[in-house]
Amino acid sequence: MATARRLMALAAGVSPRLRPLGPRAIGRQGGPRGLSTGCSRPDRTQEAAEAEAAPGEPGEGDGSVVNASRDLLKEFPQPKNLLNSVIGRALGISHAKDKLVYVHTNGPKKKKVTLHIKWPKSVEVEGYGSKKIDAERQAAAAACQLFKGWGLLGPRNELFDAAKYRVLADRFGSPADSWWRPEPTMPPTSWRQLNPESIRPGGPGGLSRSLGREEEEDEEEELEEGTIDVTEFLSMTQQDSHAPLRDSRGGSFEMTDDDSAIRALTQFPLPKNLLAKVIQIATSSSTAKNLMQFHTVGTKTKLSTLTLLWPCPMTFVAKGRRKAEAENKAAALACNKLKSLGLVDRNNEPLTHAMYNLASLRELGETQRRPCTIQVPEPILRKIETFLNHYPVESSWISSELRLQGEDILPLGKDSGPLSDPITGKPYVPLSEAEELRLSQSLLELWRRRGPVWQEAPQLPVDPHRDTILNAIEQHPVVVIAGDTGCGKTTRIPQLLLERYVTEGRGARCNVIITQPRRISAVSVAQRVSHELGPTLRRNVGFQVRLESKPPARGGALLFCTVGILLRKLQSNPSLEGVSHVVVDEEHERDVNTDFLLILLKGLQRLNPALRLVLMSATGDNERFSRYFGGCPVIKVPGFMYPVKEHYLEDILAKLGKHQYPHRHRHHESEDECALDLDLVTDLVLHIDARGEPGGILCFLPGWQEIKGVQQRLQEALGMHESKYLILPVHSNIPMMDQKAIFQQPPIGVRKIVLATNIAETSITINDIVHVVDSGLHKEERYDLKTKVSCLETVWVSRANVIQRRGRAGRCQSGFAYHLFPRSRLEKMAPFQVPEILRTPLENLVLQAKIHMPEKTAVEFLSKAVDSPNIKAVDEAVILLQEIGVLDQREYLTTLGQRLAHISTDPRLAKAIVLAAIFRCLHPLLVVVSCLTRDPFSSSLQNRAEVDKVKALLSHDSGSDHLAFVRAVSGWEEVLRWQDRSSRENYLEENLLYAPSLRFIHGLIKQFSENIYEAFLVGKPSDCTLASAQCNEYSEEEELVKGVLMAGLYPNLIQVRQGKVTRQGKFKPNSVTYRTKSGNILLHKSTINREATRLRSRWLTYFMAVKSNGSVFVRDSSQVHPLAVLLLTDGDVHIRDDGRRATISLSDSDLLRLEGDSRTVRLLRELRRALGRMVERSLRSELAALPPCVQEEHGQLLALLAELLRGPCGSFDVRKTADD
């Protein structure tokens, strides 16, 4: 009856502590016969018993649901461990993963976990929390309450022996074959006897070893639970007034008068529960049975003796009329004693596990604060001394042999060299009047001869507006064309411009640059326009994208290129002399490069008033752009679309059979979750193929992993019939030559299926597409100013994106659009995308700004954008560029920054390349940088583990993901050079490499080689990949290569530290934390150092940290020699020297502190200065032109450095245990 009243009260929301039970749970609360149906605490009041009555036996089916309460965590502080222990003890297994399945559902604010329990009965419980780990613990606590109600736990949550669990399970009807041979009962955790006089909480009596199963949590749980390293935790406890706990001065035996016991019981009304929880938390045990034992004697008056074996043997005696009363009084006396020792907080609640192990934490923290000892072999020390005596640092700084000041510093700014022709890339020379007249007449003749081809071109909606458009462009410096999808603006307007100029006899003056947001659209549109102009004028149309270029002839030229290419052209021709028009297509996408380009083009109007700017968009906020350019005219052009029939999620589920996807339907109808069901996508594509109209299928997916996932599912489903389908992935990871296949017409009887990101959303037309499957999602980079890391998130697209995607189905015939989201979601979508400039890191943008307009501050320059970024974000970018030595304190480019300006990649990677040229290990760094731009491995959701194993094998014992890249690419180059086709395919298959990505990487290496040559770092581009070239003299020195990479990426440095404390207060001494300058991070399982059982060095470098689900983690890392960190990083060092021993540390970071004898430390400091001098010399002069004597000095210095880094790390070893 009490249970029924409780359920009714809960359903009515009376209890503030427990959530209402699910309807399926009500009426199924009876326990099995012979088992206790309650989990009430000893000696509680009747009201408390009614309020806390436990649920009974699970229902007969698999659907019983019980919602967890946060308060249950007080009763079951380590619920997941307790559940594992019960099932493990009962079944004789080491882990209960198969019997406990956690299913996660991500809500907009709360995480939900449904825990499926498969023993002793199938039952489900639910938990909620702001983090996944919190929700799991809530669900596990609810399950523990069930277990206790079923009699599977004792009154104090203690476990039974395996034999008793066998009897209990028989009553539940558990099948006999699920029982394994039971293991003998084991004590919870070992402990040591201590004298109470010496007790310090967390001291020797506090157990420092965590329970094994808690240490071996799943990796995703580790990501969610949050960690604090030992040093950070100790600094927090010093600020906590409760941290300094008192020593014990009591004896080992206590027996007081009854009044004292009664007062203690008043203060601790549930003392036995409190004692059990304290011991369980302190000892990481699932039971306190073996550490607190009662012995009660007597008839009328009961005398109870409590022997407490933690934190040391203590005995408490009390009396009472009943056994329970006497035991509670003794337990209350024990609680009073623990509180006097500081082992219970002021609210009479247990402390955290870490606080009970505070002495061990302090000892570990002290170990971490000690500097690491360095021992350099005596022969190397003597070599360093000899070198420094021969080439003293201070006198060399002022040597006149190089005359490093004034005019002899290389002029690498924007004013260096002749202007470049933006169309052809050759030096710009204006046409003479005679040349212009001759070329214009030739173009007119060619135009007249092209008649039949022009007639074949279909009439497009933009054609009737030609005069309006052309007159507006002629009369206004800027014009915005708002052309609907399908109006023909992308292909036709450049031709209309060329036609007017040619037919008016001034065709040589028409040189149009048309930007496209992506490489594939620039190439495909150029080819389309070239075809429409016909063979006579085909050579007047060209394209230029990264790694591929086919420029048009000079005069009367149409050049299609990406925005990045035009930005590069502006460096060598700031006023775009020789260009008549710039057409910016698809400006509504608001990528960061386009917004940056608009700043430059707006300022360019003063330098080149004859230049005409045309902005084109289908769905953008065109009035905003008009206002940005001073109210320029907006010309609206209607488009033409064939009818497109739309289906939304509810329609799609009805077609496929709604019962097959209950979770998907419920999920989208009720939540804002951005999760894509790849099985649903696959089934929809197969359904369209089986029942839909003939024609191609274009499927929009968020990213590469989803593309590969759907591709593999389709291939498996199609099986033997795969030859009847052409499945084509489209992604920026794929080289242009492979992407062009999407435009080809498949053979008769073959259906084309294109799996693409938003790369296929605009500018390109795939003629045979009839069906569009729109996931409604895309990847979007977002920058967290607080953590200073980026997060590539899957988010909903905007309504403008939905319109564009739908339009791909109706370009050439009627079509169908299948939206994998409900109609209600469409209304919630933003009208336009958030501009990229507002949500991404700005280092590249600031560097570009300093190249184009060095006289302006970064904030001043970027304030002129259509949407100005956060000033704090700009300042952070400036600070980073100053930290890596690219900008000085006045925000001018340094000599290093001028070199970086030539290299088209992230500033830190560009710095690594520059340093690699100076340190003569260039080729491996070019490979690393290229692979960080494009992953060479053929990785997918299904084969990640296999790829990780291959990377580990390729890395050997280098401890480096980056050197795994080098070995993979070098092996491929070797196979290409000497082996046949079969050997090449075997190499790709064995090493899980992706041939198109390797081709792209090869192209990047070639491009970087050209950049390095332009930066005066090598004598000729081919030297960069030539093993015998001076720039590769030390390319086989792995520690040097990793050190140079670290020097480029610094301050991206990680120090590995032993021991951590979870956010829940659990101390894990055998785990490791990864500390950076900004705080703790996690290593992703994809880096080989995540699973390494032994690290040769405590220091790692990395390129990028990414934020996911509230945690920051690193995907790529390399172990680096501590001496490389000391010698190759920027900034100053700090030395403390007592004349015998000295410590040296980085002034800008607490991540490196080394100790050695005074002579060793002094020599290392001088060696560091010599290396800094070498870098500065090399940056101030053409590297290949340095005098022979300087080349010789640098060669000796690098040989010495390589030998030093070959030495062992010695005391820097860190052993990782299996519980990490």
From Swiss-Prot:
The keyword NAD does not apply. Residues 214-226 have a biased composition (Acidic residues). The modification Phosphoserine is found at residue 252. Keywords: ATP-binding, Cytoplasm, Helicase, Hydrolase, Mitochondrion, Mitochondrion nucleoid, Nucleotide-binding, Phosphoprotein, Ribosome biogenesis, RNA-binding. One of its GO terms (cellular component) is nucleus. Its EC number is 3.6.4.13. SMART domains: DEXDc, HA2, HELICc. It catalyses: ATP + H2O = ADP + phosphate + H(+). Belongs to the DEAD box helicase family. DEAH subfamily. Identified in a complex with TFAM and SSBP1. Interacts with AGO1 and AGO2. Interacts (via N-terminus) with ZC3HAV1 (via N-terminal domain) in an RNA-independent manner. Found in a complex with GRSF1, DDX28, FASTKD2 and FASTKD5. RNA dependent helicase. Plays an important role in the assembly of the mitochondrial large ribosomal subunit. Required for optimal function of the zinc-finger antiviral protein ZC3HAV1. Associates with mitochondrial DNA. Involved in nervous system development and differentiation through its involvement in the up-regulation of a number of genes which are required for neurogenesis, including GSC, NCAM1, neurogenin, and NEUROD. This is ATP-dependent RNA helicase DHX30.
